[in-house]
Amino acid sequence: GIQLANLYLKNYHDADRVIQSLSGVHTQVVDYLSEQVFMQLSPSVQMFLLQMSVLRKVNLQLLQAVTKHSKTQSIFEEIQQRGLFILAIDEQRYWYRVHHLFREFLENRFKATDLKQYEQAHHRAAYWYKEQGFLMEAIYHAQQAHDQVLVVSLLEAISRELVLDGRVYTLLELVKQLPEQDLSKHLHLLYDTIWVCILTHQNTLANHYIQLWHKVETSNNLILHEDQHGLAPMISLLEDDLPKAYALAQK
């Protein structure tokens, strides 16, 4: 708040009058001062900041991909020189972040004034992270862009890795957010989800996904998986078909 006030008051001589006019809780003061600081900037810098606000952390390559601005580095340096809450988060000064209060103000403004460009910025960020191999960050931005097709594609690509890393509850929470009609089109992801439910002893949920599997399975899709002989008897066991489970386990 103090830094925001300092930036705002640089262009005003009657500082006492302005300070006395401020009232309300801290967040309201921050929003008010953020608005005043923001309005002092050029339109190009304003848009740059709005686009940058969708990012939880930033670097120049990511900013270039999201903003598509020809002078990304010079504008970023200008923002730093103005003291606009850009903080380095590593010793190499490769990654930065925007102070969370200022970023929240910018992101809310961006979403309220131009939802289409807001989602487009997230979409660009999602594809940049995908190309760099940071799939969890890509999923976050794809969710914010409401690109459900990209979300489920990314999740299917990383589901096995999440299972092997022991992040099974992360996978389940993400899967639960998917429409079942999308999940049913991605059998590898559905397969991994069933295994996660089995491993975490969530039998009711496992049976739910098994029923979904049966609805969409038109052929013996289990043969697509190298560990089919482990899953097939477990499915039968959960379905209380013990003779079938025993027979499959012997194969």
Sequence positions of predicted segments:
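Generic structural signal for small/hydrophobic residues in well-ordered secondary structure
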Residues: 1-5, 49, 99, 122, ...
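Amphipathic alpha-helical "lid/sensor" segments that cap RecA-like P-loop NTPase cores
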Residues: 1-27, 43-46, 54, 68-69
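C-terminal boundary/linker of central alpha/beta nucleotide-binding cores
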Residues: 27, 31-111, 120-123
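Short, amphipathic alpha-helical segments that act as regulatory/interfacial helices
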Residues: 2-13, 53-56, 64, 80-83, ...
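Internal alpha-solenoid helical repeat scaffolds
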Residues: 180-251
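Alpha-helical sensor/transducer elements of the RecA-like P-loop NTPase core
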Residues: 1-8, 28-30, 101-108, 235-238, ...
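Extended alpha-helical scaffolding segments used for macromolecular assembly and cargo binding
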Residues: 108, 113-200, 205-212
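A conserved short alpha-helical segment within the catalytic HATPase_c
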Residues: 34, 38, 175-176, 250
